[in-house]
Each structure stands twice: as C-alpha cells, then as structure tokens.
C-alpha cells in the first residue's frame, strides 16, 4: 500500500470513509481479482471491502451494520452513566474537563450511528459531510485528551475559564483540522465525478499520525501521574488495560475484519468488535480519572430535598 492510498485498508475494512474514497486499485468481488490500473473517473462508489456485515430491511428502511449499531446504542447508555457519575463528583480535579470530553464522545457516537446505519446512506450528497464530521469529532476527542493529560501536573487550575477555553479551543482546532483534511480530500474526488488527485497523504497525516501522537502523549502523562503523583498501581493497571483494549480494537478493525466477517457469515465484521473495545477503552479512561481524583474531605457537597446544591465547609 502506498502511503497516500487507502486501497489496502478499505479492501479489508468497511470504514465509512471507504465509501467516498477512490483508488486505481480495486477488488473485483466476483472472482477476488485485484486490478491496479482501474479508472475510477465515473465511479460513484468507493473502494469495496472483501467482506462486510449484511444489512437488513426493516419497515421499508435499509439498516446497515446492525451489530455495530447495537453496540453504539449501548455505548450511548454507558456514556450517559459516566456523565452522571462525573457530575456527582463536585470537587474532583478535572471534573469540568472530563465532562466536556465525554460529551464530545457522546456526540461522536451519535454521528457514528448516522454514518454506519445508513441514516445518511452512502452515495448521497450529504454522506461525505457526515463522514467528515465523524472524523472531525474523533479528532476533537484526541486533541482534547492531549490537554486533559496535563491536568495531573497542576500546570494550571482546573475547571477555570482559562482551563476550559484551552480544552475547548484545542478540541475545536482538532475538529477543524480533521474535518477539513477529510472533506477537502473527499470533495476532490466527488466534484463533477472527476478525480483531481487520489493522494490522501494529508488526510492520513492529520487523521492517523497526529491524532495517534496526541493519544500517545496522553497515555504517557497518565502513566507519569499514576506512578509519580498518586503512586497507585491500580491506576497504572487501568491505564494499561485501556491501552490494551484500544490497541486490540484497532488490530481487529484494520487487520482481522475480513476473517471475522467471513467467520460470522457476514452478520458481524471487525467494526463490531472494534466498537466494543472502544467502549471499554472509554470506560478505562473514566475509571483512571475516578481513581486518581477524590472529593475533598474537608469540603462537603450535598443535595437538598428541593434539588439545591448545599456546600458544607468543614470536616466530615
């Protein structure tokens, strides 16, 4: 696979962006023949994977990737529970920042459902924009984690206007960078059905390499906090467990999706298990923060019967 070509990835994995990707390398499903000099000028469909989860027809509506849809619907419930638990820790360090991050992930999952389930079907005029928004939100989450990773070092006061502007501003830059890298690449391929360029190196650098670097920095920061600041090996274990789930999810999606799909007779593919791993990764991100932040025992917060927050400054 060339660095700027998605053909090798998309032939194995049914990623949403593959429906708007064009390449000279295509797989002919009827006889499993790979063509390297394919002319995609008048082709509206992107690179087809060797195997993908089958769709179902429900009430005259075609729903794609049903298994992955159920996982993402369940993920919405998990994120809502996490948001509720974060809101209950009134005095925890990084409460506002993590609340914002998980709100971003909630929005990302919603757009993932829109893209994966065919609410905006592949081939429609809106589909490339929804895919670009999904990629942009994923990038925003990665860029937000970059800033959140430094909270444990007390470089600035958490929860302040400055801190929230830093997190929100960085995530907004991440969204813009990933969205533009995606949609400009897509539009170069779909405008007037002409291929101005099939070079996607800019998109690969922004969406994959830069985001991966930011996630790596976040993990290193969390490890330093767990080992040097809070000195809690349970936190370190949660970090490694989350890292394991994340890496396992990427491997299942990008390396073994075809084998999974064929093994499950087209009912499931790598995206199903990748989504499960992503949910567990987010749970470990929350658990890591939960174990490293305790409410101030000298500053109690309770909720009255009328629903008002009551602050009690004193020993509990």
Curated annotation (Swiss-Prot):
Membrane topology value: Multi-pass membrane protein
Single GO MF descriptor: unfolded protein binding
GO biological process, one term: protein transport
Knocked-out gene: effects: Abolishes CHS3 localization to the bud neck with increased protein localization to the ER membrane.
Record-linked InterPro entries: Chs7
Gene Ontology cellular component annotations, sorted alphabetically: cellular bud neck; cellular bud tip; endoplasmic reticulum; endoplasmic reticulum membrane; prospore membrane
Quaternary structure annotation from Swiss-Prot or TrEMBL: Interacts with CHS3.
Purpose of the protein: Chaperone required for the export of the chitin synthase CHS3 from the endoplasmic reticulum.
Family as reported in the entry's similarity comment: Belongs to the CHS7 family.
Protein's recorded name: Chitin synthase export chaperone
Lineage of origin: Eukaryota, Fungi, Dikarya, Ascomycota, Saccharomycotina
């Amino acid at each position: 696979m060339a660095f700027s070509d998605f053909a090798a990835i998309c032939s194995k994995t049914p990623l949403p962006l593959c429906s708007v990707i064009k390449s000279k390398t295509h797989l002919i499903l009827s006889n499993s023949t790979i063509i390297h000099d394919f002319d995609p000028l008048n082709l509206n469909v992107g690179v087809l994977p060797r195997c993908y989860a089958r769709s179902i027809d429900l009430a005259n509506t075609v729903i794609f990737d049903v298994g992955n849809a159920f996982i993402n619907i369940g993920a919405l419930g998990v994120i809502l529970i996490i948001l509720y638990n974060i809101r209950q820790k009134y005095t925890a360090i990084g409460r506002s920042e993590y609340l914002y991050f998980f709100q971003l992930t909630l929005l990302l999952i919603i757009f993932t459902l829109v893209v994966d389930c065919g609410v905006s079907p592949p081939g429609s005029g809106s589909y490339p924009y929804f895919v670009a928004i999904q990629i942009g939100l994923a990038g925003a989450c990665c860029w937000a984690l970059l800033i959140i990773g430094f909270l444990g070092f007390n470089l600035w006061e958490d929860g302040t206007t400055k801190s929230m502007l830093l997190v929100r501003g960085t995530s907004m830059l991440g969204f813009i960078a990933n969205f533009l890298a995606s949609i400009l690449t897509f539009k170069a391929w779909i405008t007037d059905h002409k291929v101005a360029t099939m070079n996607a190196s800019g998109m690969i650098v922004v969406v994959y390499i830069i985001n991966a670097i930011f996630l790596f920095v976040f993990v290193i920061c969390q490890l330093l906090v767990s080992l040097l600041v809070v000195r809690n090996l349970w936190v370190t274990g949660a970090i490694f467990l989350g890292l394991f789930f994340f890496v396992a999810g990427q491997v299942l999606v990008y390396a073994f999706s075809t084998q999974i799909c064929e093994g499950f007779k087209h009912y499931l593919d790598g995206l199903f298990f990748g989504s499960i791993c992503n949910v567990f990764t987010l749970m470990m991100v929350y658990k890591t923060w939960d174990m490293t932040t305790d409410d101030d025992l000298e500053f109690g917060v309770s909720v009255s019967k009328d629903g008002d927050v009551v602050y009690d400054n004193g020993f509990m």
